[in-house]
């Protein structure tokens, strides 16, 4: 190797070291805002998978199903699919409230009346053994009514935000309502659910 080539190699090595050092310094600079989920991958859920959950719900009469539960640093984010059939009048004590998990609904199809409000009548703790409590939305309460609740007429395309602690109550469903649910879990009370776990769940026959 000639002296000129050696000099070029050394120079390139020095530049690479300086560049790497600058990148590392930029990444760990304590004065900059830092990602709350550093180096976390994104999550993609295809429509075909969401549709498979809806088909399973209709075939097996399942209301609520968790598609994913994802770690995003300071919280878990759950993605659920919900299918509710016709409802002429609400069932007794069917007001729901979750202490720690907030929910966002995006209505896919159907129409329903949903009552929202924080003042729950005849509040009763939900059993801690319920699958929905353990896997989907954490501890909370049921109730018989929502005092001064506000009724919303939901239809396809609508979005509803339900903070933790707010009562929500379907009082009428015209034929059905199908909605995608985003569950925001800052206390990480719900277990994570991966794509592989989702596929295994969908592959199970009815009753398993």
Predicted regions and their residues:
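Bacterial N-terminal signal peptides
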Residues: 11-21
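A short hydrophobic beta-strand segment most commonly corresponding to one strand
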Residues: 175-191
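A short, N-terminal "cap"/entry segment at the start of jelly-roll beta-barrel domains
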Residues: 25-99, 192-200, 204-208
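Bacterial N-terminal signal peptides that target proteins for export
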Residues: 1-12
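Conserved metal-binding segment of the jelly-roll/cupin
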Residues: 153-173
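Short, conserved beta-strand element in jelly-roll/cupin
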Residues: 99-114, 118, 129-141
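Double-stranded beta-helix
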Residues: 123-154
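His/acidic/aromatic-lined binding-pocket segments of jelly-roll/cupin-type domains
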Residues: 96, 102-106, 151-152, 159-160
